[in-house]
């Protein structure tokens, strides 16, 4: 506390202790007591101020302190006032109290050489090894002042000579002793030339070679700096090392020369074996500095002068060869290896070798050279990684470097183990465990399999760079002379190498021969394109089955054509369902339009529902601009021309979809001003005959999980709404965001479609409709929020989408959702869905109108059936539907 804030009585007590006025201190501490006859001479009488302070009433505390934390006892001890110190101790003053700088009363007495006061404090339990915030002990401050009697008293009381704090105790500052300067009592006595104290400390076993950790100076160097020959002689006689070097690479002899102490220099000259460096030697850098500068000649001179320099280590345990490998200087690496540098030495921090450093920094030529020179590829760093493991951790590893290390590792495995590492190990393979590559069970792991997968990854990445951006491998190029409709779609790669779904035979033949048109070669590339466009990482190698990444729930600006409001009020007051699905690609066993379609059905395509004019099943042979009607096959055919860029947008963002819709709306605005009549669209199903067609199994992908149409052979009535179709009042905006993973074979495709069809059959009550129910949409929302565990709650309470959009926080709690974070996620989704409904409805109506106008304008330019281009999987109007097997 500041002195100005002290009470008058406290100020009087501190002043009396500083001056040794025991009488005033007694009157302040013991109101009503008799004056003490032992007041020291020279002490000023307190006078009327003390009397007024005493008359004020309250007694003064004995441990009061000033603004620096100095107590009354410390002030009395520093002044050497023994009677006052004795009186304060009798009144209960704390003997080990510290001021703000860590000084105690004993340190104050030792600093000033008051032996009697120090003895009195020691008798009352003062800490003889106390240290201040700078790490100076009681013995150090006494030695600095040259107080031989106090030093002897402290040593006899048990003071530590070198006070190295072996117990690890902390100083008053809170820092450990090792963080301080490390000045011992002997160094303090030598620095100030107290020869008698030096002799006493040496007799008590002081270390003459203790050095200050910051500057590296020893007591002998301090004596040489001071110029005390007698002190230097004492230290040398007690074993001081004259060859000790400080941080400036100087000995005590050089210090004496610099200070021009000729007598000291003459005495130390014959004792010192480390001679001073010449000016040229001082200017010459060491081998590490020469490597950093890239000075080949200087490194060669240093290595020629002393070959041991090539294996020196720095503070991190790194060698010159490691530094050269990091910097990528092949000539220096060759020079060091020729000078017998240890290629397999590991640093002390991470355990890396020169080969690991060169591998990690991508210095391929150095890696080749070190491998040719016999560097050990099996050495592991402290984290267990080898050089091959490090190159696999790089974001963009060099293919040749990976191949080089892999071949060497496989050769080592073959030479040492006799079998590839991915096979079941023999009994003697335990000896290879410390260096063998981590492997998976059986033939799914091992070095060879690992390299095979990595090679596939690099090959496919290079192939993708040759394709047009966003072009899927299994889809035909858009017509260059016709407008492209920028809509979003979701496609799935074909599972087998079939070219008969590419439309015209000549196009299929060309696609089969050429690289970009081969579905088998590039079916995984489509998924790679989707994954890269979505910004998804590669958790596994591309040769494995890549699963589509489902993005989180989109922000309020999200809008997707297939996820907007699916009910629309017509001028006549009826509801218009807005969500339908285009005809699927027909299987090879059930040709519906295009010649020779793929039996496994390619990627299912999702489009927004489009309101059309009434359909006429009887006029199936005529052109109808509704692709959803029984006679809409030609409409679907024309759709392929308009949807050129349709398949290139798989996995795109919602913002890109909006921009594409806006561009298309501008293009199609002037084509037709006629507004389509609002009428219910017919169910999905391409047909050219008067009888309704049968839907082949595993053709349509719908719902949040892209489930397929049921495999049951129920027929769709084009005049009726599917019984489990979308409700006319449903207002869900749950989008289907991602494509299904690309299966690798027909068997997998069939099993997946069968199981998903069975699930959809259950949810839709056995209907073969391709539309999405409220339950599917609600399930999709919960899946996107990663809250599938709450789905049974909504199913049990029969909560549909319309009820879901009205839920509040209290409703969710009543349903049993107790987690605050989960409720907030659901409420945010509900708010987002409700907020964007009006805007989505308006944009969707305009898009549908423009879409309809485009179809009407293309009706007048319909091509001849033989010349009309037909995309893969699309139906032709002149072909009939074959019956299901």
From Swiss-Prot:
Q: What is the recorded post-translational modification?
A: Hydroxylated at Asn-129, most probably by HIF1AN. This hydroxylation results in decreased NEK8-binding.
The coiled-coil segments of this chain are none
Q: In which tissues is it expressed?
A: Widely expressed with moderate level in brain, skeletal muscle and testis. Expressed in renal tubules.
Q: What is the effect of changing residue 209 to A?
A: Decreased NEK8-binding, but no effect on INVS-binding
ANK repeat locations:
8-37, 68-97, 101-130, 134-163, 181-210, 215-244, 282-312, 316-345, 350-379, 383-414
Entry-annotated residues carrying 3-hydroxyasparagine: 129
**PROSITE patterns named among the record's database cross-references:** ANK_REP_REGION, ANK_REPEAT, SAM_DOMAIN
**InterPro entries for this protein:** Ankyrin-KH/SAM_domain, Ankyrin_rpt, Ankyrin_rpt-contain_sf, SAM, SAM/pointed_sf
State the compartments where it is located.
Cell projection, Cilium; Cytoplasm
Q: Which residues cross the membrane?
A: none
Q: Which PANTHER family match?
A: MASK PROTEIN, PROTEIN KINASE DOMAIN-CONTAINING PROTEIN
Domain comment (free text):
The ankyrin repeats are necessary and sufficient for NEK8-binding.
Can you name this protein?
A: Ankyrin repeat and SAM domain-containing protein 6
């Amino acid at each position: 506390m500041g002195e100005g804030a002290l009470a008058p009585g406290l100020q009087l007590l501190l002043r009396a202790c500083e001056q040794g006025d025991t009488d005033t201190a007694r009157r302040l501490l013991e109101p009503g007591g008799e004056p003490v006859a032992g007041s020291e001479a020279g002490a000023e009488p307190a006078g009327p101020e003390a009397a007024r302070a005493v008359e004020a009433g309250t007694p003064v505390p004995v441990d009061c302190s000033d603004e620096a934390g100095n107590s009354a006892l410390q002030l009395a001890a520093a002044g050497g006032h023994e009677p006052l110190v004795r009186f304060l101790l009798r009144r209960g003053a704390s003997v080990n109290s510290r001021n703000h700088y860590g000084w105690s009363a004993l340190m104050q007495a030792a600093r000033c050489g008051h032996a009697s006061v120090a003895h009195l404090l020691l008798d009352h339990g003062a800490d003889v090894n106390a240290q201040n915030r700078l790490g100076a002990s009681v013995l150090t401050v006494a030695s600095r002042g040259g107080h031989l009697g106090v030093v002897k008293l402290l040593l006899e009381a048990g003071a530590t000579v070198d006070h190295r704090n072996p117990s690890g105790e902390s100083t008053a500052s809170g820092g450990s002793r090792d963080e301080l300067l490390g000045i011992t009592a002997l160094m303090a006595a030598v620095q100030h030339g107290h020869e008698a104290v030096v002799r006493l400390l040496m007799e008590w076993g002081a270390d003459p070679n203790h050095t200050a950790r910051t500057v590296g100076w020893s007591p002998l160097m301090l004596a040489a700096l001071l110029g005390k020959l007698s002190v230097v002689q004492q230290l040398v006689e007690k074993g001081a090392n004259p060859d000790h070097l400080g941080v400036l690479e100087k000995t005590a002899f050089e210090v004496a020369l610099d200070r021009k102490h000729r007598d000291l220099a003459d005495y130390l000259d014959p004792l010192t074996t480390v001679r001073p460096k010449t000016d040229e030697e001082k200017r010459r850098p060491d081998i590490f500095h020469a490597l950093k500068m890239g000075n080949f000649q200087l490194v060669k001179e240093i290595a020629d002068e002393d070959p041991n320099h090539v294996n020196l280590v720095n503070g991190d345990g790194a060698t010159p060869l490691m530094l050269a490998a990091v910097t990528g200087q092949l000539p220096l690496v060759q020079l060091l290896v020729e000078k017998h540098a240890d290629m397999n030495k590991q640093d002390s921090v991470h355990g890396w070798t020169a080969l690991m450093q060169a591998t990690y920094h991508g210095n391929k030529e150095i890696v080749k050279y070190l491998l040719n020179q016999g560097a050990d590829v099996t050495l592991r760093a402290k984290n267990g990684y080898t050089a091959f493991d490090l190159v696999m951790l790089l974001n963009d590893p060099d293919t040749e470097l990976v191949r080089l290390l892999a071949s060497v590792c496989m050769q080592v495995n073959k030479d040492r183990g006799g079998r590839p590492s991915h096979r079941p190990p023999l009994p003697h393979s335990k000896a290879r465990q410390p260096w063998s590559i981590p492997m998976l069970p059986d033939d799914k792991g091992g070095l060879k399999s690992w390299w095979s997968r990595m090679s596939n990854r690099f090959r496919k990445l290079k192939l993708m760079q040759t394709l047009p951006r966003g072009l899927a491998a299994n889809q035909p190029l858009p017509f260059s002379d016709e407008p492209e409709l920028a809509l979003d779609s979701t496609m799935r790669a074909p599972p087998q190498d079939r070219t008969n779904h590419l439309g015209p035979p000549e196009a299929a033949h060309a696609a089969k021969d050429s690289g970009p048109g081969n579905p088998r070669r590039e079916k995984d590339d489509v998924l790679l394109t989707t994954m890269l466009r979505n910004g998804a990482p590669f958790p596994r190698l591309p040769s494995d089955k890549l699963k589509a990444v489902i993005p989180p729930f989109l922000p309020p600006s999200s809008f997707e054509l297939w996820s907007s409001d699916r009910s629309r009020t017509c001028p006549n007051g009826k509801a218009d369902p807005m969500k339908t699905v285009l005809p699927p690609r027909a299987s090879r066993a059930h040709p519906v339009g295009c010649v020779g379609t793929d039996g496994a059905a390619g990627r299912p395509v999702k489009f927004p529902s489009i309101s059309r004019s009434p359909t006429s099943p009887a006029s199936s042979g005529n052109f109808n601009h509704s692709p959803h009607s029984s006679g809409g096959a030609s409409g679907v055919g024309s759709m392929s021309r308009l949807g050129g860029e349709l398949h290139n947008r798989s996995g795109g963002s919602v913002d890109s979809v909006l921009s594409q819709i806006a561009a298309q709306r501008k293009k199609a605005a002037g084509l037709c001003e006629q507004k389509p009549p609002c009428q219910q669209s017919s169910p999905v199903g391409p047909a050219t005959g008067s009888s309704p067609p049968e839907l082949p199994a595993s053709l349509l992908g719908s719902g949040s999980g892209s489930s397929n149409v049921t495999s049951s052979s129920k027929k769709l009535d084009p005049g009726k709404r599917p019984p489990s179709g979308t409700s006319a009042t449903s207002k869900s905006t749950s989008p289907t965001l991602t494509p299904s993973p690309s299966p690798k074979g027909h068997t997998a495709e069939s099993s997946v479609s069968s199981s998903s069809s069975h699930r959809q059959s259950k949810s839709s009550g056995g209907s073969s409709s391709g539309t999405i129910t409220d339950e599917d949409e609600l399930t999709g929302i919960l899946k996107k929020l990663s809250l599938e565990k709450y789905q049974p709650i909504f199913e049990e309470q029969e909560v549909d989408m319309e009820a879901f959009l009205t839920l509040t926080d209290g409703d969710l709690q009543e349903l049993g959702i107790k987690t605050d974070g989960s409720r907030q996620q659901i409420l945010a989704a509900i708010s987002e869905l409700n907020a964007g409904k009006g805007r989505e409805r308006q944009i969707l109506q305009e898009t549908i109108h423009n879409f309809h106008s485009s179809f009407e304008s293309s009706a007048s330019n319909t091509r001849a059936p033989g010349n009309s281009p037909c995309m893969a999987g699309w139906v032709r109007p002149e072909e009939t539907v074959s019956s299901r097997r």
